[in-house]
């Protein structure tokens, strides 16, 4: 059997490595939002006056919606295209970050965090799948996945630090505005440096 060009690993170029940096930033931000709010709890509690139950939902609902939507978003990306889903998710993440930042009630912040979770669930499966298709050389793919995993680990650690810095100078909602420049960068560079990929054998979409 003769190997096709698609089967032969090729070295990644400048475009792929720039694309990886964009994807890594998105992954870092996705994880950051799990922890960035922790130090803001006293300030937002004083401002929004949430009940104990509402405060738990404000903190936890993002993670719940991310975890509950990952499989669905992965299948959706297979059907409509990974890059397309990533762009939709990045735009939604930016908009819902604004809603969260300027929430005027506990209920509004809970709803915004839930929508952030749905948007965040588009980032993890889309970024990893795109990395697999951008890097076909086994060694380069291993490096790229290592960078992606490192971004996840860094996001968890950096979230409280950046959140604390923002709270030192601004109001509690400013911690959500960290997403805006990253999502803007993803939306500008994504169509230029990221390939599109659809799975012709995508499974049924389960809600």
PLM regions with names:
Residues 187-207:
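Helix-loop junctions on the cytosolic side of multi-pass membrane transporters
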């Amino acid at each position: 059997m003769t190997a096709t060009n698609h089967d032969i690993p090729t070295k990644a170029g400048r475009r792929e490595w720039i694309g990886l940096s964009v994807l890594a930033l998105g992954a870092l931000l996705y994880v950051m939002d799990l922890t960035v709010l922790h130090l803001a709890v006293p300030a937002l509690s004083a401002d929004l006056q949430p009940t104990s139950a509402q405060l738990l939902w404000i903190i936890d609902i993002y993670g719940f919606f991310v975890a509950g939507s990952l499989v669905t978003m992965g299948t959706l990306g297979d059907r409509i295209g990974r890059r397309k889903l990533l762009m939709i998710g990045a735009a939604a993440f930016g908009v819902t970050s604004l809603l969260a930042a300027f929430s005027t009630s506990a209920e509004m912040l809970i709803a915004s965090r839930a929508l952030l979770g749905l948007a965040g669930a588009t980032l993890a499966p889309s970024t990893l799948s795109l990395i697999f298709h951008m890097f076909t050389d086994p060694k380069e793919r291993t490096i790229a996945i290592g960078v992606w995993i490192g971004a996840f680990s860094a996001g968890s650690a950096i979230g409280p630090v950046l959140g604390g810095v923002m709270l030192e100078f601004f109001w509690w909602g400013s911690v959500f505005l960290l997403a805006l420049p990253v999502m803007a960068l993803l939306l500008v560079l994504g169509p230029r440096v990221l390939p599109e990929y659809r799975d012709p054998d995508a499974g049924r979409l389960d809600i």
